[in-house]
């Protein structure tokens, strides 16, 4: 397995809309394995392929971080949702920042697993929020897009400054 490079906002590649996976094969399973490896190393609970510059509809999730309840969502689609909720969300592509995002309390999705088998999943709580967050990434949306223009601009400026500082240290 390999650690993948996580794109950081305002990288324009985060705005690319991911394409559906045509065939779940060994190459896709390797991407999934590398995404889980990266997600755990970065201490995240979810990762969309878009965040690692792979523009296919693939998501990995483990909200508990135990590696016992891993979810692979290939070509995920929300087929039902209800209720209203929201929390201060964080994101590996927006390190050090959090923001409130309104979400559906419960979602039902259909997706393919790592073997290409279709399944349906009903989720609530943190898992439902994480699924919606990661599907947003596949659609070219980051949580900063839900914030006011002023907050988004401040976030962008701070992240660009941080990136410049890190580049000078290399």
UniProtKB/Swiss-Prot annotation:
BP term (GO), one? translation
State the EC number(s): 3.5.1.88
Question: What top-level branch of life does the organism fall under?
Answer: Bacteria
Q: Which Gene3D superfamilies match?
A: Peptide deformylase
User: Could you give the cofactor binding note from the entry?
Assistant: Binds 1 Fe(2+) ion.
Molecular function GO terms recorded: metal ion binding; peptide deformylase activity
Q: Where is the active site?
A: 134
* CDD domains referenced in this protein's UniProt entry, alphabetically: Pep_deformylase
- Keywords, sorted A to Z: Hydrolase, Iron, Metal-binding, Protein biosynthesis
The cofactor named in the record is: Fe(2+)
What sort of enzyme, by top EC class, is this?
A: hydrolase
Which residues are listed for Fe cation binding in this entry?
91, 133, 137
A Pfam family annotated for this UniProt entry = Pep_deformylase
- Xref: InterPro entries: Peptide_deformylase, Peptide_deformylase_sf
Which reaction equations make up its catalytic activity? Answer: N-terminal N-formyl-L-methionyl-[peptide] + H2O = N-terminal L-methionyl-[peptide] + formate
Q: Which NCBIfam families match?
A: pept_deformyl, PRK00150.1-3
Could you say which protein family the record assigns here?
Belongs to the polypeptide deformylase family.
What function does the entry list? Answer: Removes the formyl group from the N-terminal Met of newly synthesized proteins. Requires at least a dipeptide for an efficient rate of reaction. N-terminal L-methionine is a prerequisite for activity but the enzyme has broad specificity at other positions.
Q: Which HAMAP family match?
A: Pep_deformylase
Report the protein name in the record.
Peptide deformylase
Q: What species was this sequence derived from?
A: Pasteurella multocida (strain Pm70)
Lineage of the native species? Bacteria, Pseudomonadati, Pseudomonadota, Gammaproteobacteria, Pasteurellales
């Amino acid at each position: 397995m390999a650690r993948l490079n996580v794109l950081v906002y305002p990288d324009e590649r985060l705005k690319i809309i991911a394409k559906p996976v045509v065939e779940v094969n060994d190459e896709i399973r390797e991407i999934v394995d590398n995404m889980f490896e990266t997600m755990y190393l970065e201490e995240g609970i979810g990762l969309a392929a878009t965040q690692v510059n792979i523009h296919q509809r693939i998501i990995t999730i483990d909200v508990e971080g135990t590696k016992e309840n891993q979810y692979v969502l290939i070509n995920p689609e929300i087929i039902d949702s209800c209720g209203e909720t929201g929390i201060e969300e964080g994101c590996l592509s927006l390190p050090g920042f959090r923001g409130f995002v309104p979400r559906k309390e419960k979602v039902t999705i259909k997706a393919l697993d790592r073997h290409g088998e279709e399944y349906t999943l009903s989720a609530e709580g943190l898992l439902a929020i994480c699924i919606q967050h990661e599907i947003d990434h596949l659609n070219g949306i980051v949580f900063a897009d839900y914030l006011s223009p002023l907050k988004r601009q401040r976030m962008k400026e701070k992240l660009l400054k941080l990136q410049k500082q890190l580049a000078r240290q290399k």
